[in-house]
C-alpha cells in the first residue's frame, strides 16, 4: 500500500509546472526507479537496516549512477519502501542506534576520490508509522538541483529500507571512510551545509529502497517563424 502524506504541496508544485504546456515543457522523473521494485528485508531474518549514515545506490545490474540527477530541476518529493520489523526487532534497533527510525534526503555534489559535498537537505521524517508500506513525502520546500548531482538517503538513526541477498552486481555506497566499513553504529551522516565526506565503503548484494521525484526545469516551446509573402 502506498501512502502519501501532505500531498497538497506536491500537488501544487506539479500543477504549477504543468499548468501552461503551450508555453513551456517540463518532465517529471522518478530518480532511482527500477522495475521490479526491491523488497526490504524486515521482518525476515536477517532483518537488516540502514544505520547512522548517508548513502546512495551505486549500481543495480547493468544500471549505474542510479541516483544521479539527469537534468537540472527541482526535487519535490521522495518515496521510501519500508520493511515491517517486529516489536523485538524494532526495540533492538531503537536501543542500539539512537532512537526511533527516521530519514531524510541529502543532495550531494560529487567530487574527486569518492568524496561528495552536501548541497541541500530535505526535512527529517519519522518512519515508524509507515512500516510495511511504501510512503511518499512531499518536501515543504522543493530543492533546486543540477545535472550530475546525486540524491542520497540520510539515516541519523536507522531505517528498514534495505533489500539484501541480491546479485554481486548490485551495490550502494555510504559516507564512511576507509577502514570503517564494518562499523555501522558510529554516526557518519552528512547533514551540515557544504560538509565533505568520503563515500569509500561499498556494500554489495544490497539495495536502498528509496527514490526521489524530480521536476525538470521547463524548456520554452519552440515556434516556427511565420513566412512573409512577397
State where each predicted segment sits.
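Compositionally biased low-complexity segments at domain edges in trafficked proteins
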Residues: 185-221
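Bacterial N-terminal signal peptides
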Residues: 11-21
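Bacterial N-terminal signal peptides that target proteins for export
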Residues: 1-11
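Extended extracellular/luminal ectodomain segments enriched in beta-structured repeat modules
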Residues: 68-88
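Short beta-strands within extracellular/lumenal beta-sheet-rich domains
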Residues: 50-70, 134-137
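Sec/Tat signal peptide C-region and signal peptidase I cleavage site
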Residues: 22-26
